[in-house]
Each structure stands twice: as structure tokens, then as C-alpha cells.
Curated annotation (Swiss-Prot):
Family that this chain belongs to: Belongs to the fatty acid desaturase type 1 family.
Function of the protein: Involved in the biosynthesis of highly unsaturated fatty acids (HUFA) from the essential polyunsaturated fatty acids (PUFA) linoleic acid (LA) (18:2n-6) and alpha-linolenic acid (ALA) (18:3n-3) precursors, acting as a fatty acyl-coenzyme A (CoA) desaturase that introduces a cis double bond at carbon 6 of the fatty acyl chain. Catalyzes the first and rate limiting step in this pathway which is the desaturation of LA (18:2n-6) and ALA (18:3n-3) into gamma-linoleate (GLA) (18:3n-6) and stearidonate (18:4n-3), respectively.
Gene Ontology molecular-function annotations: acyl-CoA 6-desaturase activity; acyl-CoA desaturase activity; stearoyl-CoA 9-desaturase activity
Lumenal topological domain: 152, 286-305
Protein name (Swiss-Prot/TrEMBL): Acyl-CoA 6-desaturase
A Gene Ontology term for the protein's cellular component: membrane
PROSITE patterns the record matches: CYTOCHROME_B5_2
Domain notes: The protein sequence includes a number of characteristic features of microsomal fatty acid desaturases including the three histidine boxes HXXXH, HXXHH, and QXXHH (these domains may contain the active site and/or be involved in metal ion binding), and the N-terminal cytochrome b5 domain containing the heme-binding motif, HPGG, similar to that of other fatty acid desaturases.
Topological type in the membrane: Multi-pass membrane protein
Record-linked InterPro entries: Cyt_B5-like_heme/steroid-bd, Cyt_B5-like_heme/steroid_sf, FA_desaturase_dom, Fatty_acid_desaturase
GO BP terms: alpha-linolenic acid metabolic process; arachidonate metabolite production involved in inflammatory response; fatty acid biosynthetic process; fatty acid derivative biosynthetic process; linoleic acid metabolic process; long-chain fatty acid biosynthetic process; positive regulation of cellular response to oxidative stress; unsaturated fatty acid biosynthetic process
Domain of life of the source: Eukaryota
Length: 444
């Protein structure tokens, strides 16, 4: 057991030598009301401070009781600056005889991954090409302008309306990928400028909330495809995913829906409804319930601009229908792209793997091409993006060969597939999970 375990959070007066702890004790502090974590062998009590964590209390809580060094380094740009917030939370360090990593984390893989990140830094792969992002923003604004021009010049017949809807859905999808860049702090050196532009892109160009996205998306990056930690696999009993969940549902005789047909009803309620029905409602309610008035103001500016532009063409009701049709189209694009990298991979309880292994277990890539890069917002390089979330996306292909080499060295599978195959695999994965559920439901 550790020594000095009663020392409170935020203590500024410490006796020498610093209290030491064993992993056995640290791992007990993994509750919502009792959170310790380890960074660079230092032990921190983040119980109270997690409520003030800019990235949200959940993401920091997902690493309670374990080493969070690589996650800490992956998410933050200025380690010296954020390190100042950790100092008052320091309560001790690992005992000298304790390994730096806990449980299923590989020290050799971790050492090699950190060397790889240093190589990426030496290659200037975290340096931004600002012209690239300017052109991305510009082509979004051009599409927004083109949509207005089409209706102004050709009128509001069915064909101009459909063409305009597809143009605006494309603009929304591309704005979604662009806000993702700023949300990950991968454009500017200073976090503040990333945050400011992020609010503009996700708020004014899309009508969504930066804080809602941050709190949700960083959990996904911290613990991808981990039940009870990754919100992206929280399916609200609509789907059963992976192998563990369908077996659990089957054994417990849970049948909220006929999951053996989920690969069929996915087409009806997955891609069509996620954004217009679920996300749109959840985002608005989250901003109101959390009194996030800044994000709400940005979102309102989007809706004001949209209705000011399109009510003269369609009237109030028509503009509302037009908006939701655009969301409907965008939702298909968003769901297929975001699920092709993760849904087909391992989805399970937390095995407490090291950063590199955990990201590779939950992530696969899609082959590179100019279209695939544009269509997916470079999320076809999802493996590299998950390993280095602050790396500008135009550099992800440059680090990919080195990631492949590291995978080969340690016998870790690096999955990369054609775009069509990746999309088909989504349906195949749902079908497989549904069959596992049915077998367990009937026979176990």
C-alpha cells in the first residue's frame, strides 16, 4: 500500500520525500467521487478539479486509476502551460519498484511510439499549412454562395431545389470535417485561436455547439470503442455492437428490437435520422440545460442566416422542411464515413491497453486518393489521426509508413481497405453482431 494516502487534493505543503504509491492502491481510485491518475510517474488527485477540466469531467475520469501520460500528451498543445494546472493536484509518485505503466500496457510499444512521435516532430509534421485550411474554408463559403445563386437564377422548382440541397449538404459535410480540425487544435499553435475559429465553424456555419462536440468527441478519442466510455458506441438499445454486447443482451434475454435484422433497419434509422432527429435535438437541449449561452448564440446565428436567406424563396414552413432535408442528406454522408473506421473493429470493455495498441485495436484506414481524402475529411487516415490528434490532416499520409512499420515490428495488424469495402463492412459487422445476439438469445 502507498504512504501518505490521506494527503488532500491541492495540497501545497509536502514533506520530503514525496509520498509513494503502488499501482494496487492507485487503481482503487477510479470512482466518480475519487479519481487519481498517473502522468510521467507522478500521481495526481483530480477528483474535484475534473469538474473544471476544459475537456469535460468524463474524459479525464476515463483514465482514473491508470497511467494517462500518452493521452495527456496527445490532447494538449502546450504541455508546460497545462502542467501548471497539475502542480496543485500532485499527491505523490509511483514507488521506485513500480513499473511506469499499469496492467495491459506494453512498455516496449510505448517506448517505440514515443520515439515515433519525436520523429514526427523532427519532420515538422505538426506544422500547419495555413493555405490548405484557408482553401477548405473558402470552398465551403463558395458552396454556400452557389446555393443562393442557383435559387436566385433558376427559381425554386424541384430540380434547382434538389441541386441546391445537395450543394448545401456537401457544404455542411465539409464544414463538419473542418470544425473537426479546429476542435482538435490542429491548425494554430495557440489553443485559443483554434477554439475561436472552432466556435465560428461549428456554430455559425453548422448551427452546432463546440463544447458539446469537445466533451463528446474527446471521450471517443481517449477510449475508442470501449463500452461505458466511448459515447460513439452508445446505441441506446437500437443496435448491439461488437461481440461482447450482443452476447450480454442475448444471455439476459434483452430484445428491445429484433437485432438479427439490425443490418436491415440500419438503412432506415441510422444514416437518415442521426443528425436531423438525434444530434440536432441533443445539441440544442445540451446548450440550454448547461446554460452554454455563447455556443447557443453562435448556433442561433446559423439559423438566423439560414432562414433569412431561404424564407424569401420557400416561406417559413418550406424553409424548415428544406433545412431538415439538407440535414437528412448530410446525415447519410456523416454516418457512413464515421462508422467505416470504427464500427467494424473491436468493440469491448476496457482492456487498459497502451495508447498505441488501444487505437490500433479500434481503428482502421481507407485507401488514399484525392476523392477519399476530400470525401472523408482525411479520416481515411483514421489510425494516424487517432495516434496524433493534433497533427494537421494534410500531414497524416506522411507519418503513415512509419506507423505501418511500428505495427509490423510488434505484430499489430494495420488495417487498410478500399472505400467501397469499408462501407460494405459496416453492414456485415452489424449482421454478424445480430447473429451473435440471436444465437445467445435462443440458446444461452
Amino acid at each position: 500500500m502507498g504512504k501518505g494516502g490521506n494527503q488532500g487534493e491541492g495540497s501545497t505543503e509536502r514533506q520530503a520525500p514525496m509520498p509513494t504509491f503502488r499501482w494496487e492502491e492507485i487503481q482503487k481510485h477510479n470512482l466518480r467521487t475519487d479519481r487519481w491518475l498517473v502522468i510521467d510517474r507522478k500521481v495526481y488527485n483530480v477528483t474535484k478539479w475534473s469538474q473544471r477540466h476544459p475537456g469535460g469531467h468524463r474524459v479525464i475520469g476515463h483514465y482514473s486509476g491508470e497511467d494517462a501520460t500518452d493521452a495527456f500528451r496527445a490532447f494538449h498543445l502546450d504541455l508546460d502551460f497545462v502542467g501548471k494546472f497539475l502542480k496543485p493536484l500532485l499527491i505523490g509518485e509511483l514507488a521506485p519498484e513500480e513499473p511506469s505503466l499499469d496492467r495491459g500496457k506494453s512498455s516496449q510499444i510505448t517506448e517505440d511510439f514515443r520515439a515515433l512521435k519525436k520523429t514526427a516532430e523532427d519532420m515538422n509534421l505538426f506544422k500547419t499549412n495555413h493555405l490548405f485550411f484557408f482553401l477548405l474554408l473558402s470552398h465551403i463559403i463558395v458552396m454556400e454562395s452557389l446555393a443562393w445563386f442557383i435559387l436566385s437564377y433558376f427559381g425554386t422548382g424541384w430540380i434547382p431545389t434538389l441541386v441546391t440541397a445537395f450543394v448545401l449538404a456537401t457544404s455542411q459535410a465539409q464544414a463538419g470535417w473542418l470544425q473537426h480540425d479546429y476542435g482538435h487544435l490542429s491548425v494554430y499553435k495557440k489553443s485559443i485561436w483554434n477554439h475561436v475559429v472552432h466556435k465560428f465553424v461549428i456554430g455559425h456555419l453548422k448551427g452546432a455547439s463546440a463544447n458539446w462536440w469537445n466533451h463528446r468527441h474527446f471521450q471517443h478519442h481517449a477510449k475508442p470503442n470501449i463500452f461505458h466510455k466511448d459515447p460513439d458506441i452508445k446505441s441506446l438499445h437500437v443496435f448491439v455492437l461488437g461481440e461482447w454486447q450482443p452476447l450480454e443482451y442475448g444471455k439476459k434475454k434483452l430484445k428491445y428490437l429484433p437485432y438479427n435484422h439490425q443490418h436491415e433497419y440500419f438503412f432506415l434509422i441510422g444514416p437518415p435520422l442521426l443528425i436531423p432527429m438525434y444530434f440536432q435535438y441533443q445539441i440544442i437541449m445540451t446548450m440550454i440545460s448547461r446554460r452554454d449561452w455563447v455556443d447557443l448564440a453562435w448556433a442561433i446565428s446559423y439559423y438566423m442566416r439560414f432562414f433569412y436567406t431561404y424564407i424569401p424563396f420557400y416561406g417559413i414552413l418550406g424553409a424548415l422542411v428544406f433545412l431538415n432535408f439538407i440535414r437528412f442528406l448530410e446525415s447519410h454522408w456523416f454516418v457512413w464515413v464515421t462508422q467505416m473506421n470504427h464500427l467494424v473493429m473491436e468493440i469491448d470493455l476496457d482492456h487498459y491497453r497502451d495508447w498505441f495498441s488501444s487505437q490500433l485495436a479500434a481503428t482502421c484506414n481507407v485507401e488514399q486518393s484525392f476523392f477519399n481524402d476530400w470525401f472523408s475529411g482525411h479520416l481515411n487516415f483514421q489510425i494516424e489521426h487517432h495516434l496524433f490528434p493534433t497533427m494537421p490532416r494534410h500531414n497524416l499520409h506522411k507519418i503513415a509508413p512509419l506507423v505501418k512499420s511500428l505495427c509490423a515490428k510488434h505484430g499489430i495488424e494495420y488495417q487498410e481497405k478500399p472505400l467501397l469495402r469499408a462501407l460494405i463492412d459496416i453492414v456485415s459487422s452489424l449482421k454478424k453482431s445480430g447473429e451473435l445476439w440471436l444465437d445467445a438469445y435462443l440458446h444461452k
